[in-house]
């Protein structure tokens, strides 16, 4: 997966899809009460990016529904994944609980309700911290309560706090989430990978590849903009790279030394199937 980073309005979405990205990451902001309101990041953000692009969340979902529905004039065949980077910092537990329910409601009303079996996006619901787990609890409860639990086949889950994954697994177990987990590791592109290192990323990949282990389906790295970082991630065996330069990452994947081992995922590929790195 070549995941375009910080895609918060329609112009930049078009630009990244034109570059060939098969997935995007979008930042979702919430009111103090927990209502999902906008695709928006704000300052500070990644280096060499404009931080203030924005669009209403309802409009965003309607637009990506058009882009991901076969037969729609706007359909983009290669567009198959969206990481919803949920900006939950500062919300009370009550607001987090409301937010999870309302995110489910909005996905149903503005994305799935007009063709639940026709649309193609897998949503990765990305929560910043395990202490915000009640958000996922109410998200799941609401989807099941209104009879859309079949659409959980198109949903993955992630905590992005870069914590000890053995502890993260316990949180997933407590939530009753035993599959469809996309684990991630990363930091802003303003800090070189050299300073962060790849030890945690390597640990996630090793854990993913343990036979019979089900709590990691995919591993992606963020936010990689340099060739050395992207090549290192591919060599380690990641399933996805989040980047500010999708065409650059795709170009690296298509180089002869990588194209024999990697290709961009398509809709025909299972977003929860493990592709274990061979020895």
From Swiss-Prot:
Keywords, sorted A to Z: Cytolysis, Dermonecrotic toxin, Disulfide bond, Hemolysis, Lipid degradation, Lipid metabolism, Lyase, Magnesium, Metal-binding, Secreted, Toxin
Cofactor: Mg(2+)
Active site: 5, 41 (nucleophile)
EC number: 4.6.1.-
Main location as per UniProt: secreted
Keyword Mitochondrion set for record: no
Disulfide bond residue pairs: 45-51, 47-190
Superkingdom assignment: Eukaryota
Signal peptide: none
Annotated positions binding Mg(2+): 25, 27, 85
GO MF term (any one): phosphoric diester hydrolase activity
InterPro entries (alphabetical): PLC-like_Pdiesterase_TIM-brl (IPR017946)
Keyword Magnesium: yes
GO biological process, one term: killing of cells of another organism
Cofactor note: Binds 1 Mg(2+) ion per subunit.
Cellular compartments per GO CC: extracellular region
Subcellular location: Secreted
Catalysed reaction, written as an equation: an N-(acyl)-sphingosylphosphocholine = an N-(acyl)-sphingosyl-1,3-cyclic phosphate + choline; an N-(acyl)-sphingosylphosphoethanolamine = an N-(acyl)-sphingosyl-1,3-cyclic phosphate + ethanolamine; a 1-acyl-sn-glycero-3-phosphocholine = a 1-acyl-sn-glycero-2,3-cyclic phosphate + choline; a 1-acyl-sn-glycero-3-phosphoethanolamine = a 1-acyl-sn-glycero-2,3-cyclic phosphate + ethanolamine
Known tissue expression: Expressed by the venom gland.
Role according to the record: Dermonecrotic toxins cleave the phosphodiester linkage between the phosphate and headgroup of certain phospholipids (sphingolipid and lysolipid substrates), forming an alcohol (often choline) and a cyclic phosphate. This toxin acts on sphingomyelin (SM). It may also act on ceramide phosphoethanolamine (CPE), lysophosphatidylcholine (LPC) and lysophosphatidylethanolamine (LPE), but not on lysophosphatidylserine (LPS), and lysophosphatidylglycerol (LPG). It acts by transphosphatidylation, releasing exclusively cyclic phosphate products as second products.
Similarity annotation: Belongs to the arthropod phospholipase D family. Class II subfamily.
Protein known as: Dermonecrotic toxin LspiSicTox-betaIE3i
Organism expressing this protein natively: Loxosceles spinulosa
């Amino acid at each position: 997966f070549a995941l375009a980073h910080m895609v918060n309005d329609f112009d930049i979405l078009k630009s990244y899809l034109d570059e060939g990205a098969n997935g995007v990451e979008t930042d979702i902001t919430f009111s103090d009460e927990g209502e999902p309101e906008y695709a928006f990041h704000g300052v500070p953000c990644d280096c060499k990016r404009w931080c203030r692009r924005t669009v209403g969340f309802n409009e965003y979902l309607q637009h990506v529904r058009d882009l991901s529905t076969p037969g729609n004039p706007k359909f983009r065949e290669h567009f198959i994944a969206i990481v919803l980077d949920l900006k939950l910092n500062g919300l009370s537990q009550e607001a987090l609980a409301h937010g999870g329910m309302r995110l489910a409601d909005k996905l149903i009303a503005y994305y799935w309700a007009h063709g639940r079996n026709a649309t193609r996006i897998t949503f990765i619901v990305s929560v910043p911290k395990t202490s915000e787990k009640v958000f996922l609890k109410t998200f799941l409860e609401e989807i099941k309560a209104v009879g859309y639990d079949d659409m959980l086949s198109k949903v993955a889950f992630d905590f992005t706090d870069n914590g000890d994954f053995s502890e993260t697994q316990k949180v997933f177990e407590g939530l009753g989430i035993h599959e469809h987990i996309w684990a991630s590791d990363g930091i802003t592109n303003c800090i070189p990978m050299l300073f962060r290192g790849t030890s945690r990323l390597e640990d996630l990949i090793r854990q993913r590849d343990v036979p019979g282990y089900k709590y990691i389906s995919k591993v992606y790295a963020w936010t990689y903009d340099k060739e050395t970082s992207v090549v290192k991630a591919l060599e380690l065996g990641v399933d996805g790279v989040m980047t500010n330069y999708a065409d650059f990452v795709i170009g690296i994947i298509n180089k002869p030394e990588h194209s024999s081992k990697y290709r961009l995922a398509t809709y025909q590929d299972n977003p929860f199937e493990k592709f274990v790195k061979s020895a």
